[in-house]
């Protein structure tokens, strides 16, 4: 997924990903 790359640039995206799961 594209947001996997963003995880490195945007640590806050990790929170969003946790909410998705």
UniProtKB/Swiss-Prot annotation:
The name this protein goes by in its record: 71 kDa F-actin-binding protein
More info: On the 2D-gel the determined pI of this protein is: 7.5, its MW is: 71 kDa.
Domain of life of the native organism: Eukaryota
Record has Nucleotide-binding as a keyword: no
Keyword Transmembrane helix: no
Posttranslational modification: The N-terminus is blocked.
Role of this protein: Binds directly to F-actin and induces actin filament bundling. May function as a regulator of actin filament organization.
Molecular function, one GO term: actin binding
Key words, A-Z: Actin-binding
Similarity comment: To yeast fimbrin.
């Amino acid at each position: 997924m594209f947001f996997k790359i963003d995880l490195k640039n945007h640590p806050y995206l990790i929170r969003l990903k946790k909410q998705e799961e």
